[in-house]
Amino acid sequence: MLFHRILPQYKTAISTYLTPTHCRLYIANLVTSRRMTNIEAAKKLAAYRAVDENLPPHAKVIGIGSGSTVVYVAERIGQLPNKDDFVCISTGFQSKQLIIDNGLKLGQIEQHPSIDIAFDGADEVDPQLNLIKGGGACLFQEKLVASASDKLIIVADFRKQSKHLGQNWRQGVPIEVVPIAFTKLINDLKRLGAKSVDLRQGGKAKAGPVITDNNNFILDADFGIIEDPKSLHLQLKQLVGVVDTGLFTGITEKVYFGEESGEVTTWDGVVTGSTTEEVIAESK
């Protein structure tokens, strides 16, 4: 029934060459494709709104993070008529390329330690605007830029929303570590309650572990549901060999989500105890 409704003009031709199983697979792929198109459109809208509503008119230094939604942030900033009036600070290789590709001026944080505003993505966000970041192995530079910024704005899609950190993001908390300390740190993290700790590997693109832009390793530590992200971050930072963690707490001002429906949801911090559903309802 769905097949005949969606593709009436192709019904005879496709039915001639495809079995019922192939038809169902074709329709499933078509629906998935349309869903992803809606998500991408919403991500773009969220990014554009984030820039339009938050970028100071006389900003001189802007931080640009990484992630699939931040691509649209850089695109929007690159459309500004005054883009020659400011410099952009990257958080890693990907964001550096985004800055260059969109005709923006690239600056260095060593020369511009005070940043007017930063835009970045996230792997998971809870209603208190705590974040898990570091899926792209840029967490230290992302946190450095965020901490130097007067305002941090996060853009992401709805799949990054979560009632608690660790609920939807199952890969663990990314932790950047000094290479010589990684073996000891695996044991230390397990003693702190990590269910598992993995040294992140380069996969097909690289034999061996991922090397960050700072020549460090990434450990992914699964602590399950994280009830107190700030406390966990502070405990992890006390371990010798830890450079920084992917837990970002008390630093985000607002989050823009592209929804599956094509709409944009914004979170700007709520009273502790509110549920994700309540936050979404309040923000629409």
Curated annotation (Swiss-Prot):
GO terms for molecular function: ribose-5-phosphate isomerase activity. It comes from Lodderomyces elongisporus (strain ATCC 11503 / CBS 2605 / JCM 1781 / NBRC 1676 / NRRL YB-4239). It comes from the Eukaryota. It is found in: Cytoplasm. Keywords: Cytoplasm, Isomerase. The gene is RKI1. Its EC number is 5.3.1.6. Pathway: Carbohydrate degradation; pentose phosphate pathway; D-ribose 5-phosphate from D-ribulose 5-phosphate (non-oxidative stage): step 1/1. SUPFAM superfamilies: D-ribose-5-phosphate isomerase (RpiA), lid domain, NagB/RpiA/CoA transferase-like. This is Ribose-5-phosphate isomerase. PANTHER family: RIBOSE-5-PHOSPHATE ISOMERASE (PTHR11934:SF0). It catalyses: aldehydo-D-ribose 5-phosphate = D-ribulose 5-phosphate. Belongs to the ribose 5-phosphate isomerase family.
